[in-house]
């Protein structure tokens, strides 16, 4: 075997064929590693939607929950030829999308119905916010003990900076990484 001659096979085997139907070739069907898992992605912007995208790309059924007015990333440039945000479209591909106002009683009931049957719940609402609306891990894991709960926040759920708002650029500056990128 020539060095590098099996590269495509390694890529297809290790990462799956990049086709959305997950078939390696016409004769053999590839079953994605997360096929059969249901993920509720109640995140916005960059980090959370990217996590949801990785799960969707690995075969999970991902349902993106957007607030009334949509994910704020829908307003980001650059735009696709159809006028939508390229970043939003890229990070939210292969997901179903529902608009639910989880701050209202009706919206909370809708979201709880989805989370009850889910395998994974993603939220980036900020420390303590999910608990305030009845979506903290301690509450929803009672109805769904198998649930994997991922709460994303810049500085974690506890600690001196937990309530500080931030962005990726601020974190890069705090860590010194910004010095390497200019």
Segments predicted by a language model, with ranges:
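N-terminal helix-loop segment corresponding to the beta1-alpha1 unit
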Residues: 9-182
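A glycine-rich dinucleotide-binding beta-alpha-beta segment and adjacent secondary-structure elements
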Residues: 1
């Amino acid at each position: 075997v020539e060095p590098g001659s099996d590269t495509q096979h390694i890529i297809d085997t290790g990462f799956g064929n990049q086709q959305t139907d997950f078939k390696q070739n016409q004769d053999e069907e590839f079953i994605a590693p997360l096929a059969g898992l249901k993920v509720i992605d109640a995140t916005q912007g960059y980090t959370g939607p990217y996590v949801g995208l990785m799960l969707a790309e690995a075969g999970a059924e991902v349902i993106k929950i957007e607030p009334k007015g949509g994910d704020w990333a829908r307003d980001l440039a650059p735009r696709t030829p159809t006028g939508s945000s390229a970043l939003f479209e890229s990070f939210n591909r292969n997901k179903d999308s529902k608009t639910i106002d989880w701050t209202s009683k009706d919206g909370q009931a809708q979201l709880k119905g989805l989370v009850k049957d889910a395998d994974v719940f993603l939220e980036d609402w900020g420390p303590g916010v999910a608990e305030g609306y009845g979506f903290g891990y301690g509450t929803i894991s009672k109805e769904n003990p198998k649930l994997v709960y991922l709460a994303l926040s810049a500085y974690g759920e506890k600690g001196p900076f937990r309530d500080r708002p931030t962005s990726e650029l601020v974190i890069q500056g705090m860590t010194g990484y910004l010095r390497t990128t200019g």
